[in-house]
């Protein structure tokens, strides 16, 4: 496939490496937010990894260029419903994921199942920690938010999540799911969910060893998206 990469930072360069290794051609490398749809129109599909304030405009440029787009940018989801409606109404293809890693999406699946089981055991309190590299600006991470939403959907005793950077404090009630965010050098991503009681802990965790898992998942999603119309996510790709 002919691929346009929108966002040519560390992740974009890793995506390029994976795409080339899988026999694809990168026909556009976009690192300027003022690019035009014409610059990507010759691609079969685009992968977008930029910043939250650029994502919506970048997606709409892909729609204007009439190419499918797989979006890995997070923290732009206040615009998601409007963008998804445009995709459906105009017959475009939009694939979004808070995390393209296959392993993380397995964690999403296990997380929901565990929360459903733990709904019957009130003696356990659930908390979450997420750690990323210093360059990651948003917190909690999109992955942590997806995990939190999975827990809240299954665990009746938690009503909302509260995300705090390490060292921050806030009033956290028994009804709140506390997410602690840490920013440390050279950490691609680590997410841990712990159910703790007076007698034991139950923990599930995903630790990324590099950006390669995210990049490979994004390229696989882009391959899958070609020729489709509509709005999709990792559950569609993985048949969860």
Where are these regions (language model features)?
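C-terminal substrate-binding/catalytic lobe of Rossmann-fold NAD(P)-dependent oxidoreductases
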Residues: 2, 10-38, 120-240
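Short acidic/histidine-rich motifs immediately flanking catalytic phosphotransfer sites
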Residues: 40-47, 63-68
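Short glycine-/small-residue-rich Rossmann-like dinucleotide-binding loops
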Residues: 50-51, 74, 183
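Rossmann-fold NAD(P) dinucleotide-binding segment
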Residues: 52-72, 80-83
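Rossmann-fold dehydrogenase core element
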Residues: 68, 83-101, 118-124, 128
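Rossmann-fold NAD(P)-binding glycine/threonine-rich loop
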Residues: 73-94, 105-116
């Amino acid at each position: 496939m002919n691929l346009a990469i929108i966002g040519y930072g560390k992740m974009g360069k890793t995506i390029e490496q994976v795409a080339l290794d899988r026999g694809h051609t990168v026909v556009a490398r976009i690192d300027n937010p003022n690019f035009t749809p014409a610059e990507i129109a010759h691609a079969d599909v685009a992968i977008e990894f930029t910043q939250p304030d650029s994502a919506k405009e970048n997606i709409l440029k892909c729609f204007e260029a009439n190419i499918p787009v797989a979006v890995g940018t997070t923290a732009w989801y206040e615009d998601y419903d409007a963008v998804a409606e445009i995709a459906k109404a105009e017959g475009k293809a939009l694939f979004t994921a808070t995390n393209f890693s296959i392993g993380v999406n397995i964690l999403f699946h296990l997380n929901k199942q565990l929360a459903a089981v733990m709904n019957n055991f009130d003696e356990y309190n659930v908390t979450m920690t997420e750690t990323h590299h210093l360059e990651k600006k948003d917190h909690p991470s999109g992955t942590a938010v997806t995990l939190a939403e999975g827990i809240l959907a299954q665990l009746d005793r938690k009503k909302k999540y509260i995300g705090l950077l390490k060292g921050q404090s806030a009033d956290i009630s028994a009804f709140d799911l506390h997410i602690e965010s840490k920013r440390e050098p050279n950490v691609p991503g680590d997410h841990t969910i712990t159910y703790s009681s007076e007698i034991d802990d139950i923990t599930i965790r995903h630790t990324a060893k590099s950006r390669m898992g995210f990049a490979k998942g994004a390229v696989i999603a882009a391959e899958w998206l070609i020729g489709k119309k509509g709005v999709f996510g990792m559950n569609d790709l993985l048949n969860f």
